[in-house]
Amino acid sequence: FVLVLGMTGMSGNVKAADQTDLKTIDIMFVHDTHSHLNSFSTVVDEKQEMIGGFARIKTLIDEQKEKGPDTLVVDGGDFSMGTLVQTVFETQAAEIRMLGALGCEATTLGNHEFDYRSKGLAKMLETAAESGDTVPELLVCNINWDAMEQQGFSEGQQQIRDAFTEYGVKDYVMVQKGDVRVALLGVFGKDALACAPTCELQFTDPVEAVKKTVAEIKKNEDADIIVCLSHSGTSEDESKSEDEILAKKVPDLDVIISAHTHTKLEEPIVHGDTYIVSAGEYGKYLGSLSLEQKADGRWGMKEYKLTPIETDIAENAATPVSYTHLRAHETGA
């Protein structure tokens, strides 16, 4: 299941660059927002502060897109479960629709997307698909449909399979950002699966699935850069740090947006030519990175930052209107 957006011509490998015409790309990202569409109160430097909120994140994204219209915006999953917004997860698909309103182009599944069981996830995806809104691509490359089909789909598995078809869930997509052809793929990690007791789906090994998907991209697409949305995470114990293992085992990945462990990486973790980046949780920070292609075709980091989403950032006026409308359905107002 592959979608190609704004591309012409497919061939070969990730390309080496002409040294006289090096390409650049800007990426902004969130993950583990857990239904925190609105700002929320917390203690910062021993003071009660209102932080986060999609309206402020939208302001920063819009400001960046004024400077760089081809900025890529992505999410790493666990966009649901954590505030009262989750009560309209099925009926309004508020979280994924609001990601679309931010300009987010792709996301992946986190373990909390399964909290309302197969029926709930299926209903949410159907609601989003039928809403008429622009919603992110949903990317997961390691669902083991073959094994489930051989065993005979359960009712829940069939519900999700049908909803995936309606929504258009894929292993990867190609997107065009200026002169840069971006391959985006998503993967669901081992610990994420262990944290999803209501998940009825079966998954293949994340590393092996990413290897296979990257090989397919390199064979069939004319990609300049490969970005993985991984709901796997990192750990201080490198032997258990899933996204570090992924970076080492699949060195053709250029960037891993690392979600699940709510890690806040002030600097990227670097293995070879692969950058692992994370921006904490609940939309407290908006991650951004600027990359420049090197002569060998790989990418160097020009800038990386996590911007705190605090009250000094003006709220985009249209965004609260959107999620207030969606939340009104909690009470039938």
Predicted regions and their residues:
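Bacterial N-terminal signal peptides
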Residues: 1-6
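Short, intrinsically disordered, low-complexity terminal segments
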Residues: 13-14, 180, 330
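Acidic, proline/serine/threonine- and glycine-rich low-complexity intrinsically disordered segments
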Residues: 320-321
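Conserved small/polar residues in nucleotide/adenosyl-binding loops
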Residues: 324-331
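Acidic, metal/ion-coordinating pockets
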Residues: 17-311
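Short, surface-exposed beta-strand/loop "edge" segments at domain boundaries and coil↔beta transitions
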Residues: 312-317
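Sec-dependent signal peptide cleavage junction
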Residues: 7-19
